[in-house]
Amino acid sequence: MKDRLFLLGQHLLPHHLLSRAAGRLAECRVPWVKNSLIKAFARHFQVDMGQALIEEPTAYEHFNAFFTRALKADARPLDPTPGAILSPADGAVSQLGSIEQGRVFQAKGHSFSVQELLGGDTASAASFQGGNFATVYLSPRDYHRVHMPLAGTLREMIHVPGKLYSVNRLTAENVPELFARNERLVCLFDTECGPMAVVLVGAMIVASIETVWAGVVTPPPRQIKRWRYDEATHPPVRLDKGAELGRFRLGSTVILLFGADRVRWRDGLAPLGELRMGQAIGQASV
């Protein structure tokens, strides 16, 4: 009964209104408000502040600054293996495997279209036909910045408007095409092993998504917005392996896509396995 009520609420609640309200609260600078929020969150999720660059929780100007906090330089070492594909974030592997018939596995009985995930872009979807994917759910208690799995040059960024369902096991198993229905930011890169997509998927109370090259992405609502990065439009953006790509103002999910025969996932990398940013999750085939 509890699960049914939760799922019913997912369909009835005003997703965007709640997320905007959460965003305003998370940016509040009133000391007693933001300190209460930060302390309650840190206590509930047992956040380890010893790894943070600023260890005192109340030193952050607002909750979002705390949530997207930087870590000490040695807190997330990068796997030095040549060709290693790095985990883009702290969290857990939700699913990983092959892209079959243009679809990505979501949960038992559910999958979603790569083309829909990428905002209906047929050409981009074709480049991942027969490829591989990994879905990483960001853990609330850990680090909330997203980093590059491989070095790459940004080719295109696509903002796809949509719903803001919560992202968890229950919704993954019960909301068809969850990740292709939620609002998301698609980042398409050229890498040494071919095309790579890094898709930042929003969720309920995820107030915004930010990238290091464009800041907070706030396109017109209800419209798919595309940015090309080449000499004719925006300057090319080159990011090294392990470099910060962006961050969630509150967390959600990152989906990685690679082309056919381009990656081999690490043995023993099981669904729900815990990850740290910078750990190797696979090996690239150049």
From Swiss-Prot:
Domain of life: Bacteria
InterPro entries in alphabetical order: PS_Dcarbxylase, PSD-B, PSD_type1_pro
Catalytic reaction(s) noted: a 1,2-diacyl-sn-glycero-3-phospho-L-serine + H(+) = a 1,2-diacyl-sn-glycero-3-phosphoethanolamine + CO2
Primary enzyme class: lyase
Residues the record marks as site: Cleavage (non-hydrolytic): G251, S252
Annotated GO biological process: phosphatidylethanolamine biosynthetic process
Active site per database record: D90, H147, S252
A Pfam family the protein falls into: PS_Dcarbxylase
Gene Ontology cellular-component terms listed: plasma membrane
PTM remark: Is synthesized initially as an inactive proenzyme. Formation of the active enzyme involves a self-maturation process in which the active site pyruvoyl group is generated from an internal serine residue via an autocatalytic post-translational modification. Two non-identical subunits are generated from the proenzyme in this reaction, and the pyruvate is formed at the N-terminus of the alpha chain, which is derived from the carboxyl end of the proenzyme.
UniProtKB keywords: Cell membrane, Decarboxylase, Lipid biosynthesis, Lipid metabolism, Lyase, Membrane, Phospholipid biosynthesis, Phospholipid metabolism, Pyruvate, Zymogen
Required cofactor(s): pyruvate
Subcellular location: Cell membrane
Pathway the protein acts in: Phospholipid metabolism; phosphatidylethanolamine biosynthesis; phosphatidylethanolamine from CDP-diacylglycerol: step 2/2
Membrane topology: Peripheral membrane protein
Sites of Pyruvic acid (Ser) modification: S252
Molecular functions (GO terms): phosphatidylserine decarboxylase activity
Cofactor, how bound (note): Binds 1 pyruvoyl group covalently per subunit.
Annotated EC: 4.1.1.65
Purpose of the protein: Catalyzes the formation of phosphatidylethanolamine (PtdEtn) from phosphatidylserine (PtdSer).
HAMAP family: PS_decarb_PSD_B_type1
Family to which this protein belongs: Belongs to the phosphatidylserine decarboxylase family. PSD-B subfamily. Prokaryotic type I sub-subfamily.
Oligomer and partners: Heterodimer of a large membrane-associated beta subunit and a small pyruvoyl-containing alpha subunit.
Protein's name in the database: Phosphatidylserine decarboxylase proenzyme
